[in-house]
Regions:
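Helical hairpin unit composed of two closely spaced alpha helices linked by a short loop
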Residues: 292-333
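Mid-bilayer segments of alpha-helical transmembrane spans in multi-pass integral membrane proteins
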Residues: 121-134, 153-170, 190-198
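Generic multipass alpha-helical transmembrane bundles of integral membrane proteins
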Residues: 176-297, 301
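Interfacial loop-to-transmembrane junctions
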Residues: 330-350
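Membrane interface segments of multi-pass transport proteins and intramembrane proteases
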Residues: 108-113, 212-228, 327-336
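Gly/Ser-rich, low-complexity
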Residues: 1-97, 101-120, 133-144, 148, ...
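Residue-level signal for the membrane-embedded core of alpha-helical transmembrane segments
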Residues: 90, 94-98, 126, 130, ...
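Extended, low-complexity, charged alpha-helical tracts
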Residues: 152-159, 163, 325-329, 333, ...
Length: 375
């Protein structure tokens, strides 16, 4: 009688284990479909750019087709697309600087302080009207880029949590979900309701302080610039450190749990325990491969999403630096102050954009590198 009971329990255990393996296979297929839908959530322009570098899907084989030449070609193409407005504005600014220097050099009446002040104000106003609106557009474009990237990450996070759970990293998935949802929601809300108005106010202060020496806001502008950059750097450092520490702790916990599960299967399930343990390990390996493909795809997608905004900021910084250099060569001082102020705003926008992109990329990369599978 006891022998029959043992045989019945063994058969029931085998059926449950085989059913679990079959269910896991179906779940893996559903996860693959969810990962493939990430491509559809991107904008048409980003899809086109991803395909231009050889990425048609989050499949690991498609990701391996990315080449250095295709990436450089995409960067050059984006540079040519985003350089027209900054270079056109720079040409106008350089023309104003040259006219200012000519009038200052060849007209004796301009040696009077009041007339020279009028010329300085007029030149600064001309440069202001040329630069302010494009810089405001640059700020708005960067905020839109950050919002789009945050929304994409919010679509990706539940998929990655499911992958982590099925690969034996349930604790890591829960930790990642809580941190990243908070980060993405916070970045999206702060970008539209705080960062964008703050940058526009900062630009207004910089312009006001450069038009006339009677409104001396340069110290305030310098302080705002330093505070913004230090806050961004501090927040990014704390977030990255928190992600790393929690990732290391949860990965160690998940690794012990997975080893305990495999040990239990191989030790307490008779006859086929060792085979089921190896099957469990194989399923984990396939899910880890899916996780790596999804993570690398998201990193590439985030980089492509941020690429136009980052290149625009770099081109603007180069153009403004070129104008400042020419202004210093020909000896005009007041317009140079305006150019320095606008350049400070653009560099702040660039720092914010790069830091937010880095947070998304680092958090995704940590999931790939930390706990590369419950071995």
């Amino acid at each position: 009688m006891s022998r029959k009971i043992c045989v019945f329990i063994s058969e029931l255990t085998i059926l449950i284990a085989l059913s679990s393996v079959s269910t896991n296979a179906q779940d893996i297929s559903e996860l693959e479909n969810s990962v493939n839908k990430l491509m559809d959530s991107l904008s048409d322009e980003v899809k086109k750019d991803m395909k231009s570098i050889g990425v048609d899907s989050p499949d690991i084989m498609s990701l391996s087709d990315v080449s250095f030449d295709s990436v450089i070609s995409l960067i050059v193409d984006k540079l040519s697309q985003n350089s027209k407005a900054p270079l056109s504005a720079s040409a106008v600014v350089i023309a104003v600087l040259i006219l200012n220097a000519l009038f200052d050099s060849y007209t004796d009446s301009l040696r009077q302080s009041s007339t020279k002040e009028v010329l300085s104000v007029v030149s600064t106003l001309c440069i202001t009207t040329t630069l302010v609106l494009p810089v405001i557009d640059l700020i708005d474009d960067c905020i839109i880029t950050v919002t789009d990237a945050s929304n994409f990450m919010l679509l990706y996070i539940p998929i990655m949590v499911a992958i982590l759970t099925f690969s034996g990293h349930a604790v890591s998935g829960a930790s990642y979900y809580s941190l990243m949802v908070l980060a993405c929601q916070g970045v999206s809300q702060l970008s539209t309701k705080f960062i964008s108005p703050l940058l526009n106010i900062y630009l207004g202060f910089c312009v006001s302080s450069s038009i006339s020496d009677r409104v001396n806001l340069k110290s305030l502008c310098n302080m705002l610039s330093k505070v913004i950059k230090w806050l961004i750097a501090f927040t990014m450092t704390v977030f990255s450190a928190l992600m790393t520490i929690r990732g290391m702790i949860t990965t160690a916990y998940d690794s012990v749990t997975a080893r305990a599960v495999r040990f239990t299967m191989s030790s307490f399930i008779p006859i086929v325990g060792a085979a089921l343990s190896e099957s469990y390990k194989t399923i984990q390996g396939s899910i880890n491969l899916l996780r790596t493909g999804a993570g690398v795809f998201v990193i590439l997608a985030i980089l492509v999403v941020f690429l136009p905004s980052i290149l625009r900021c770099l081109i603007w910084m180069f153009s403004l630096s070129l104008c400042k250099t020419i202004g210093e060569i020909i000896g005009v001082s007041s317009p140079i102050s305006m150019l320095s102020s606008v350049s400070s705003v653009v560099s702040t926008v660039f720092a914010i954009t790069v830091c937010i992109m880095s947070v998304f990329v680092i958090s995704t990369a940590l999931l790939i590198t930390l706990g590369g599978g419950a071995q």
